[in-house]
């Protein structure tokens, strides 16, 4: 459990998200800056389209959906090989975004 949790948390930190570490669940919320994506649904769609990793918008987990509009939920109850692949794909989110930003500026 802890190995998988830390693997995902480290990956999320590498791509600029702030993970909230669970004490016992296999789900992890992670916050993102609103200048990166306009909201949780947009972030979910972007990550799925870019790298094929499914997340759930944080809005689904709050009584007031706007309280979770800067968060995504990730599941790490996966086989280790699947989690390793998902983390590798997630690390591409950061690189692809950086490449697009550089090409836009140039």
Regions picked out by a protein language model, each given a short descriptive name:
Residues 1-106:
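PLP-dependent class I/II
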């Amino acid at each position: 459990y802890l190995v998988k949790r830390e693997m995902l948390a480290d990956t999320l930190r590498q791509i600029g998200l702030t993970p909230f570490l669970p004490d016992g669940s296999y789900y992890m919320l992670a916050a993102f800056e609103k200048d990166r994506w306009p909201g949780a649904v947009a972030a979910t769609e972007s990550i799925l389209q870019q790298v094929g990793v499914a997340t759930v918008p944080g809005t689904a987990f709050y009584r007031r959906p706007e309280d979770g509009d800067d968060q995504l939920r990730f599941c790490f109850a996966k086989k280790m090989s699947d989690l390793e692949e998902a983390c590798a794909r997630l690390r591409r989110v950061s690189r692809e975004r950086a490449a697009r930003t550089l090409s836009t500026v140039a």
